[in-house]
């Protein structure tokens, strides 16, 4: 693999995807410390919202320590060069949330849908572009469909006004060949002016390899998170990825030592538990399950006595997708009752 001379824009997820790992309980002080540290290290883009995007505050997804607006207004005025993005899932976030984010100073709106449901993004992508934002179409759980189907959905988002399309490995399921195929087809068939991005999870330990494959295939934006702070086994650990890019001659514009220090001195002490490929996170990747389901399944294990691993495998078998968190408790209860009935009949 020869990536010498390529340029890539890195996008930090630790203050959005990392919200899942923190049960959305990141304080304003922590948010500011991480964001300003990343800014000083040269990170060009930082995502800040509830883990499930703008408007995610709910019983289903979790109540954050502060509102999206409070986080955005606390952080954005303190940044010197980094720009801030906000994730928006139609059906959770609204056009009013989008306008609020832009009013706070957000420059990039990333409109996320399940990989087969790009059509629900038309209103939000169109409004974002009309209001002058850098507008990204974000196709989640992209491992579930073929490269041709990803392209079909990407073309819809592009037609609505997205200037960047993301192939998103929400489950950490993909291997490099699949990433290469999907990113390569997007790069070959979309408008040359449309940027291509990749968002990986480390559930199978493949996030760095997959991100490199994405760059080789034509991606110019890569998501990750400092210290890997994110759902499941986390996102592509950016301090590691920056080091790999430096060795391979890929220009990121990031100061390696500074981002290492943000990871070690600020983010790791914030963690409620180590972000690693444990058996439950590995099961997410192996079964192709949405990464933010991990803590929900672990809580259900404690409540109903059904191993999280078994719950996750069944969720994968049923083809559950992001937004179906409410099914996890129902499934765990059903599995618990079924096991009790088996014991009685035995």
From Swiss-Prot:
UniProt cross-references to PROSITE patterns, sorted A to Z: PYR_CT
UniProt binding sites for substrate: 16-17, 170, 199, 290
Enzyme Commission number: 4.1.3.39
Pfam families: DmpG_comm, HMGL-like
Segments forming domain Pyruvate carboxyltransferase: 8-260
Active site, UniProt feature: 20
PANTHER family, A to Z: 2-ISOPROPYLMALATE SYNTHASE 1, CHLOROPLASTIC-RELATED, HOMOCITRATE SYNTHASE-RELATED
Descriptive protein name: 4-hydroxy-2-oxovalerate aldolase
Protein species of origin: Stutzerimonas stutzeri
Lineage: Bacteria, Pseudomonadati, Pseudomonadota, Gammaproteobacteria, Pseudomonadales
């Amino acid at each position: 693999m020869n990536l010498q001379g390529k340029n890539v824009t890195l996008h930090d997820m630790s203050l959005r995807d990392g919200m899942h790992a923190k049960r959305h309980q990141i304080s304003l002080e922590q948010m500011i410390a991480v964001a300003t540290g990343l800014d000083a290290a040269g990170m060009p883009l930082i995502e800040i919202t509830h883990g499930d995007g703008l408007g995610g505050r709910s019983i289903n997804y979790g109540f954050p320590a502060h509102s999206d607006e409070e986080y955005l207004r606390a952080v954005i005025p303190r940044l010197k060069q980094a720009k801030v993005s906000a994730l928006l899932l139609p059906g959770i976030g609204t056009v009013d949330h989008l306008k609020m984010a832009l009013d706070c100073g957000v420059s990039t709106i990333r409109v996320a849908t399940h990989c087969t449901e790009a059509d629900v993004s038309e209103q939000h992508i169109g409004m974002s572009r009309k209001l002058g934002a850098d507008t990204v179409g974000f196709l989640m759980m992209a491992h579930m469909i073929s490269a041709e189907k990803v392209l079909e959905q990407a073309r819809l988002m592009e037609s609505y006004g997205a200037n960047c399309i993301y192939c998103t490995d929400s489950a950490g399921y993909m291997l490099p060949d699949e990433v290469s195929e999907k990113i390569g087809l997007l790069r070959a068939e979309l408008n040359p002016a449309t940027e291509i991005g990749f968002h990986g999870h480390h559930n199978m330990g493949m996030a760095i390899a997959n991100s490199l494959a994405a760059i080789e295939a034509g991606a110019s934006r890569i998501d990750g998170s400092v210290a890997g702070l994110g759902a499941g086994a986390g996102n592509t650990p950016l301090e590691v990825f920056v080091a790999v890019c430096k060795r391979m001659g890929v220009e990121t514009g990031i100061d390696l030592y500074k981002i290492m220090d943000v990871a070690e001195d600020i983010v790791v002490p914030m963690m409620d538990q180590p972000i690693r490929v444990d058996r439950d996170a590995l099961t997410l990747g192996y079964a192709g399950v949405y990464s933010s389901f991990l803590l929900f399944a672990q809580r259900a294990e404690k409540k109903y006595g059904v191993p999280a691993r078994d719950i996750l495998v069944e969720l994968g078998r049923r083809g559950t997708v992001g937004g179906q968190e409410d099914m996890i408790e129902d499934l765990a209860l059903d599995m618990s009752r079924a096991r009790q009935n088996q014991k009685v009949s035995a």
